[in-house]
Amino acid sequence: NPLMPNFQWLPVGYHGRASSIDVSGQSFKRPLGQTMAPGADAPSFGPSKRMDYELEIGIWISRGNELGEPIALDDADDHVFGLCLLNDWSARDIQAWEYQPLGPFLAKNFATTISPWMVTLEALEPFRAPWTRPADHPQPLDYLESADNRQRGSFDIRIESWLQSAKMRDANQ
């Protein structure tokens, strides 16, 4: 499906619950939901058969702001305590059925796992890189723009993940 016109203009987020966040290595129940098999006349209900995860970077917020008061981009780093690795788990078969037109809901709110380690922004400072936006993309609106952020840059962090099954672990692979 083509991206909606607002994709390049608005930050994208998903619904989740703080109660579904746990430390990596914890087990969780496979989510239940509706799925629609190819060629089926009606959806069925049951456990997800297509589990997946997205490796992401989690941000730990150190202090808040007054309700309804935005935080200026130039002040945002002062509110961040550190970063961690985060696995955003998804039930892709449930998501395929429920995501249009409003986006995933039950397919993405059942589990999020985070690393037990956190890295401070101070430790990441040597990894800042110039921030640029592709010429064919619209420039951000003023409230999403900061000359200081452009000058300081963003963090150039590259992450990879590998999946290792119990069978692979037993075989030392």
Short names for language-model regions:
Residues 1-172:
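Active-site microenvironments in enzyme catalytic cores
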